[in-house]
Amino acid sequence: IQNYALKQYGGDLALGANGIITSVGMLQVMLIIGIAQGMQPIVGFNFGAKQYGRVQETLRLVIIISTVIMGIGCFCSVAFPELIARAFTNDPALLEVTANGLRICLLVFVVVGSQIAISQFFQSIGIAWKAMFLSLSRQMLFLIPAMLLFSRFWGLDGVWYAAPFSDFVAAVTAWLFLWYHVKSMKGKQEE
């Protein structure tokens, strides 16, 4: 769906730019996935031992670290998109399309770190459906409809703007799931 929209509104240059943007984004996301997966045994063990303070502290630390890493990546992608794109291509037309796409697509990438960490947290404590929902929400549930809608109004920029919209809505959803979970856990601890 994304490649079709990119081809329709931006041609081959948009497809090439998307390959570069995806690579840049995945480099950042892979770091966060590694950190979040490292959190899982710590959270799982302490959750099973009913050491909820340790669980909260571990999750808090991972969210902070993930947000800082993604914040640095987000800043660099928005502030220096041409420089980043030059690591992949020296074609002037592709550089221009890629720089614009990087600036837009990774605009709110800072929130993706917490979204991934929260998703991995739910997997760690055995709430698989929430983890699965959060994992699918960013790249499917919110991205595809936004891309189809936004591209009709704004063309190629609409395809690009669907990514930060999806990232933001998925992060808000993750935080709402976490807030509700913490609230319900406090109620259980008081009983």
Give, region by region, the residue ranges found by the protein language model.
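Short runs within selected transmembrane alpha-helices of multi-pass transporters and secretion channels
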Residues: 32-36, 105-124, 130-139, 159-175
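Small-residue-rich hydrophobic transmembrane alpha-helices
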Residues: 18-75, 79-81, 112-131
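Alpha-helical transmembrane segments of multi-pass membrane proteins
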Residues: 20-28, 92-118, 145
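Helix-terminus/linker motif at the lipid-water interface of multi-pass membrane proteins
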Residues: 1-23, 27, 45, 83-92, ...
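Short alpha-helical transmembrane segments in multi-pass integral membrane proteins
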Residues: 43-108, 149-191
